[in-house]
Amino acid sequence: MYERRHERGMCDRAVEMTDVGATAAPTGPIARGSVARVGAATALAVACVYTVIYLAARDLPPACFSIFAVFWGALGIATGATHGLLQETTREVRWVRSTQIVAGHRTHPLRVAGMIGTVAAVVIAGSSPLWSRQLFVEGRWLSVGLLSVGVAGFCAQATLLGALAGVDRWTQYGSLMVTDAVIRLAVAAAAVVIGWGLAGYLWAATAGAVAWLLMLMASPTARSAASLLTPGGIATFVRGAAHSITAAGASAILVMGFPVLLKVTSDQLGAKGGAVILAVTLTRAPLLVPLSAMQGNLIAHFVDRRTQRLRALIAPALVVGGIGAVGMLAAGLTGPWLLRVGFGPDYQTGGALLAWLTAAAVAIAMLTLTGAAAVAAALHRAYLLGWVSATVASTLLLLLPMPLETRTVIALLFGPTVGIAIHVAALARRPD
């Protein structure tokens, strides 16, 4: 009797997972249709992000822009950590589709994300007297409030993205990304029109945290994905997510939170710091923003090819390397002119610096790839160790007694190689 009930439960579960994916074409994570959907959404999201940064840089003086950039970076660190929920949810949902389901506890990822987001918001707000004065030199309490609420919202948003990726709902996945970016752009545009100043851009940075609610209200497919359960209890899910969240937080320090890292390791940023931060942001965005947006595709791809860990890395790595090579050439030849024309004479940098910063972006992109492969293989400790080691190495390199531009390039170029080596070594080991 137990075997019959167990088989019936497995069949019911399989039907449930199939129903969620039944409304769209059966395309895989790197099939042409899937990549096209996410790629188009990413292009729109990148355009919105670039426009927000452009509006802030044009509307604010360099010294004030560096204040905005530090908040943007702090939010990036916190919300980047929530990508651990995206990764773990994608992996768990994907595994449910490709492996047999045994009887036992089930977890609702979106509810867990709500609990994690609430705890994170309370911790950020409660601990803010210890660190906010040093980090937020203007608009301190507004920054703390927006950061706390924004993180709670982005926890739920990342989990919904992970569920959509796990069941190949790439149209809704892309729509959620675009909704987030468009909301931010709309608030930034309003800040320009009404002369809101720095506060307006702080609101713009966090406004996208409500996008997941709008998606749930508008899309039955999103509601179906959000209702999915994964094997194991809450403790099992949280243990796996904890490694991913910690590692994603470390990755966010290098990817989104680098202005914060510069602030911590420098006496004063000033106008020069604002120019360097803008250069770092613009040279890495063409690679890292799309790559971050396609984390769901990548993890689903690596899960599907988990018996060929290193071979599955080759094609994405070649694409990243090719784009990076073209980007280095373009940044070196046209970057200084584009900065001068687009952002004004206060933002002047040399072509060599822009080319080297683009090379550094390639290094971080490769680390992002190997990290996604490690998550897909359930190598949580290796994933965590790789990103934390890369972040520590980059931080130490930023302390070198060199000009700001030089140590920035060295830190962003060589720090990630430590993490890449750790990830590749773990992936090279024979699966158990």
UniProtKB/Swiss-Prot annotation:
GO terms for molecular function: host cell surface binding. It is found in: Cell membrane. Keywords: Cell membrane, Membrane, Transmembrane, Transmembrane helix. GO terms for cellular component: plasma membrane. InterPro entries: Poly_Biosynth_Transport. It comes from the Bacteria. It is a multi-pass membrane protein. To M.tuberculosis Rv3630 and M.bovis Mb3654. This is Uncharacterized protein Rv1510.
